[in-house]
C-alpha cells in the first residue's frame, strides 16, 4: 500500500510497507531544490537496525552486499532510481526478503540517455548522506569501494561521498567497502 505523507518542495515522500511491516521510504525530487524530508522518517522505525548500506543503484545492494543483507538488520540507502517503477519494485522485493529497511533517493542515474555526473546535485547528495549518518548510531557502514568495483563513476562517487561523511563524523573504524569488505 502506498501512503502519501507529504509534498515537499519539488517532490514527495511516500512509504511502501510490506507484510513484514518493514518499509521502503522514497524521496521523489529533482536536484534543483533541497529536500529536507529525511526527518519525516519516524525515529522508532530504525530501532534494532545498526547497520547501514549506501549504494548508488538498486541491485548494487544485492550484487555487492547480498550475503550481508541476509545476515543482519540493514538500512539500505539507494541514491538513484526512485523514479523508476521497475527498479523500485525490485528494490522493495530485496528489502522485504532480507528484513531490511530501504531508503531510496531519486538522484539521476541518466539524463537524456547519458550517465549523469551528479554535478548539479552533489551538494544535495552530500547533505542527504550526512543526514542519514546522523539518524542512528550505526555500528557498521558499508558502501562501494573507492575504485567503484569495476570503475563505475556513480560507485566511485558514492564511495567518496560516504567516506567523507563518515570521516567527518570520526567513524572510519565502522566503514567497510564492497569487494573484499576491506576495513577502511
Predicted regions and their residues:
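Short, well-ordered beta-to-alpha junction loops that form the rim of enzyme active sites
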Residues: 143-147, 153, 180
Amino acid at each position: 500500500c502506498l501512503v502519501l505523507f507529504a509534498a515537499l518542495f519539488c517532490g514527495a515522500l511516500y512509504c511502501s510497507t510490506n507484510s513484514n511491516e518493514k518499509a521502503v521510504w522514497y524521496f521523489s525530487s529533482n536536484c534543483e531544490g533541497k529536500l529536507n524530508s529525511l526527518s519525516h522518517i519516524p525515529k522508532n522505525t530504525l530501532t534494532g537496525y545498526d547497520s547501514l548500506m549506501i549504494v548508488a543503484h538498486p541491485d548494487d545492494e544485492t550484487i555487492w552486499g547480498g550475503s550481508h543483507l541476509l545476515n543482519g538488520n540493514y538500512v539500505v540507502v539507494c541514491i538513484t532510481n526512485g523514479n523508476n517503477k521497475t527498479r523500485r519494485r525490485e528494490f522493495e522485493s530485496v528489502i522485504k526478503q532480507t528484513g531490511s529497511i530501504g531508503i531510496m533517493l531519486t538522484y539521476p542515474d541518466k539524463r537524456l540517455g547519458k550517465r549523469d555526473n551528479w554535478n548539479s546535485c552533489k551538494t544535495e547528495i552530500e547533505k542527504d548522506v550526512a543526514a542519514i549518518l546522523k539518524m542512528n548510531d550505526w555500528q557498521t557502514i558499508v558502501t562501494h569501494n573507492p575504485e567503484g568495483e569495476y570503475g563505475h563513476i556513480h560507485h566511485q562517487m558514492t564511495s567518496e561521498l560516504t567516506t567523507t561523511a563518515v570521516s567527518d563524523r570520526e567513524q572510519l573504524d565502522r566503514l567497510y567497502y564492497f569487494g573484499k569488505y576491506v576495513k577502511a
